[in-house]
Amino acid sequence: TEENVTGIAMTPYTPQGKSLPGLRRNDTYYTSLPTNSVQAVMINKIFVDKAETGAYGLQPVWPTTLAHELGHYLGLFHVFSGGDNGQTTDYCEDTPDYDRPAYDTWLASVYRPTFAQAAQRQDRNGTTFTSYNIMDYYYSYRDRITPDQRARIRHVLDYSPLIPGPKIAVENMSRAEIIIEEPLILK
């Protein structure tokens, strides 16, 4: 429901010749921005003036939500997986992947953990780490990206035609205006 969603973002697409794993590919290139399809980041107005309260104090929700959603808009994915499949979900080798449902279970079992304790995770190899990544959820410092994430962002900025800014030319691309139907929306 909208009361539970703090923000959403559309992910970019990259040209066929310069694609990135996990992102949509297209073999055409926009010559101008479409008028009936908007690539955007949205923050739920319910959360703009709201602060999370709890054992860790009062913290505004929207600044980290905005940074997180901008990460999606620039080609980043969550740094956790949803269960037993053991698959890294963000296509970045330098972000530790952890099992989010297992973390949820652990967190629910601990009586009033400190923020530092709640920010601890165990990766798929059993190694404990502290969550600092902006693409994480829950209790995390959420103030960093990794070099691989930076490289993905740079690639999207250089090649994705719907992100403003100068682009690196891609050979053998048609210059037709095409509207992408059903953009991928991440929460």
Where are these regions (language model features)?
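Extended N-terminal export/anchoring regions of large proteins
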Residues: 1, 129, 151-155
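Active-site-proximal segment of zinc-dependent metalloprotease catalytic domains
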Residues: 1-81
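Residue-level detector of intrinsically disordered, flexible termini
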Residues: 8, 115-118, 168, 175
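Generic low-complexity segments that are intrinsically disordered, proline-rich and/or Lys/Arg-biased
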Residues: 13-16, 22, 97, 102, ...
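Surface-exposed charge patches in extracellular/virion surface proteins
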Residues: 18, 121-124, 175, 187
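The catalytic-center signature of Zn2+-dependent metalloproteases
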Residues: 49, 53-144
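Pan-zinc metallopeptidase signature
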Residues: 139-186
